Amino acid sequence: MKNRQLYKYGLKVYGFEFINGKGRECLEKVVQNDTRRYPLCDEVNLLIRTSYGTLNVVTAPGFMFDGRSGPKIVDWYAPNLGTLEERICWLVHDCNGYGQDLSFEDTNLLLFAMLRDLAGY
């Protein structure tokens, strides 16, 4: 998906697939805490299938993500961790925000599409 313009309404996210069994378990085991910083217990390797191709997201054990960024006041609507699908959205957004191939704008467009198509927002 590098160097492609992702259009807010044209991008579709069809699903995700964990490449290793430990990634799903690792994300499911994360427990919310007051610091809102979550080190992953193992590698997470997953594929995000979109209308623009497939994005492979791989993290190392110990990768730190913060769930949904932003103030606690909106946790009632968009939880800091939430469902597995929401956690995947937050994780992929954090991974792309740390020097991956997508621009900041495209990273946010992918997040919005994932929330719409995977998490039901």
Mark where each language-model region is.
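Extended terminal accessory/targeting regions
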Residues: 1-121
